[in-house]
């Protein structure tokens, strides 16, 4: 997959973003990227607590009782997961070269996350048949394989949406109310839980920007704080 152009990061700030507002911003950026009105862009943010159900979510994956946060059906792949404070969510809105290779793109996101957590001393890995980034089982500590980052994407008209979520210092009990990503035989973890010290979203922003730009082959990258100012959409 050849290089993308300059990658523009928008850090939406420390206040958690309601999911529907973030999703609408993705859609507005997506149609402008398809029309070449904006550059390749990545939204970096934290969400208010929310469960998002991808297209493969079954009724058995959903909360059986009131989970304490909205459950929203969305147009990405995958099953159900949680987003909320203490979790870095990244939404690349990037034009991929033809022919599209969705698997290669997902592997790039996984590689970026593996490099990010590697900077903090953790050895991330892939698990065959499962997306996301994992930590190996630790039988001596009584720990199964643990998922530290979830990935779910949508590609339409050659441009990506949705992306990945990396657990930093979020409350992991939110995942107890669902079958996260449809996987029953593994755990969920965070940087803070693994390192036994607080690692917040702000602590991993620079590493995330650097490694994601590198795996996407961006010629350069820069960060803008705040929500993007969108040009008026012109439908070609």
Curated annotation (Swiss-Prot):
EC identifiers of the protein: 2.3.1.181
Main location: cytoplasm
Residues at the catalytic site: 181 (acyl-thioester intermediate)
InterPro entries referenced in this protein's UniProt entry, alphabetically: aa-tRNA-synth_II/BPL/LPL, BPL_LPL_catalytic, Octanoyltransferase, Octanoyltransferase_CS
GO cellular component: cytoplasm
PROSITE patterns referenced in this protein's UniProt entry, alphabetically: BPL_LPL_CATALYTIC, LIPB
GO-annotated molecular function: lipoyl(octanoyl) transferase activity
Biological process terms in GO annotation: protein modification process
Site, Lowers pKa of active site Cys: residue positions: 147
Catalytic reactions on record: octanoyl-[ACP] + L-lysyl-[protein] = N(6)-octanoyl-L-lysyl-[protein] + holo-[ACP] + H(+)
Residues bound to substrate: 76-83, 150-152, 163-165
Keywords annotated in UniProt: Acyltransferase, Cytoplasm, Transferase
Pathway: Protein modification; protein lipoylation via endogenous pathway; protein N(6)-(lipoyl)lysine from octanoyl-[acyl-carrier-protein]: step 1/2
Domain BPL/LPL catalytic, first and last residues per copy: 36-220
PANTHER family in the cross-refs: LIPOYLTRANSFERASE 2, MITOCHONDRIAL-RELATED (PTHR10993:SF7), OCTANOYLTRANSFERASE (PTHR10993)
HAMAP family documented for this protein: LipB
Family the UniProt entry places it in: Belongs to the LipB family.
Protein function: Catalyzes the transfer of endogenously produced octanoic acid from octanoyl-acyl-carrier-protein onto the lipoyl domains of lipoate-dependent enzymes. Lipoyl-ACP can also act as a substrate although octanoyl-ACP is likely to be the physiological substrate.
Additional facts recorded: In the reaction, the free carboxyl group of octanoic acid is attached via an amide linkage to the epsilon-amino group of a specific lysine residue of lipoyl domains of lipoate-dependent enzymes.
Protein name as it appears in the record: Octanoyltransferase
Native source organism of the sequence: Thermobifida fusca (strain YX)
